[in-house]
Amino acid sequence: MEKILVLDFGGQYNQLIARRVRDNNVYAEILPYTAPLSEIKEGNYKGIIFTGGPNSVFDMSSPHYTKEILELGIPVLGICYGCQLISWMVGGNVETAEQSEYGKIDLTVTKKQSEIFADVDETSVVWMSHTDRVKVMPSGFEITAKTEACPIAAYENEEKKIYGVQFHPEVTHTQFGFKILHNFLYNVCGCHGDWKMDSFIDDTVKSLREKIGDKKVILGLSGGVDSSVAAGLLSRAVGKQLTCVFVDQGLMRKDEGNFVEKTFTSLFDMNFVRVNCQDHFINALKGVSDPEQKRKIIGTEFYKVFWDEIRKQAEKGFFAQGTIYPDCIESGKGDADKIKTHHNKVKMPDDVEFIDVIEPLSSLFKDEVRAVGEKLGIPHELVWRQPFPGPGLGVRIIGEITKEKIEVLQNADWVLRDEMAKNGYEKNLAQFFCVLPGVNTVGVMGDHRTYDNLVAIRAVTTDDFMTADWAKIPYDILAKVSNRITNEVKHVNRVVYDITSKPPGTVEWE
């Protein structure tokens, strides 16, 4: 399989670069700038991309790399900081720019015959985000593009196949960004494009069968996208050798537990174990209102219930997880041995032993996981499931959690989802849900005064969840949702809409 290395120097778009490469049907993997040269030599990469980063190359505490990487005969593309770093490594001069460039900037291609600018307009819009720039080109390199404030916006050494661009081709704001990356991958690196989800499924199923043999596999199934797709792949590979353990703590959306069970027992050949334990969790949460304490209790009790069920399985065999690629990436922003902790990485108790851990999705980004899920025939509702907090509705009920509050919130949330679906508006939203703030308000229903629950609606639009804006849902849809909730959901007499962006707020209320 063809591979491109994305060498991480701490930029915010590093995962996006890898995803854009994969969008071109070429596999990309990310390594931190601390990866030894020997590892890169052994990687059999078709090309290397130096990422951006927040540092200045002339600060000796900034991330650097040995010059030998440019002598491996592998094509290299430097982006932003990576562009400056390559120039610095081979004798160029980098300076703090007289005028920084941020946002959309007009780029002029000065060498039309450049391989990476093939079929790119002479003038186009690119996305810039830099305070430093290359001032003097190193020997053997030539300028291929410029902007008004950046005379060296792109350069190349065609003979050595080393390229640099000061802008960010990976972001959608760069008009020909996808084409520029495509040109580097196909025109310069000589890739053919063998990274496709159909072949991934076939290859993964084959390797799973070889590894598992006739042993058993246990997977913790949450009903989320990652564990669901992992279950689908494992089921296709080993069928009844797979046992999925689904802990229903009673804090899921309305009828979601039944939907998950029905989906996997009807579509896939596997053993499905459902543990219904709502009462257990409600008892453990009795009298607790602090959000962090609730999270801790839910996590601790889930861990206990899940592993108690695992211990009941006669044969352990292998343990499978829905770990995906972003869970595994080492970040160039910190120490190389520091890996992000994530809920998809499960800690095992000391008294439970397995042959090995299997992570069939560990090479995929989330969008690729969804693509695999669709090809496996997993329902759209699961494949495109919105982000849902690990503690479930436990962090959407402000204050103490009771069975009655769960029912109110589940019913209100179901109405919201139903109306968004009926109006075809759900595709416009990154996330939407109801919150029970724990506030009662005075109302009038018929001839009677009421003092019942207030329900808040939260809906946001975002590309990355780092920032988010409140969604501008049409008033007529909001009015219909409010009317239905107050009429159909018992013990609710008022509905409000949260119009707070992130920052200063967060998407979830707790």
Named regions from a protein language model:
Residues 1-50, 54-60, 64-72, 88-317, ...:
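RNA-binding accessory domains that recognize and position tRNA/RNA substrates
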Residues 78, 82, 87:
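Gly/Ala-rich beta-loop-alpha elbow adjacent to hydrolase catalytic centers
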Residues 320:
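Active-site regions of oxyanion-processing enzymes, predominantly non-cytosolic
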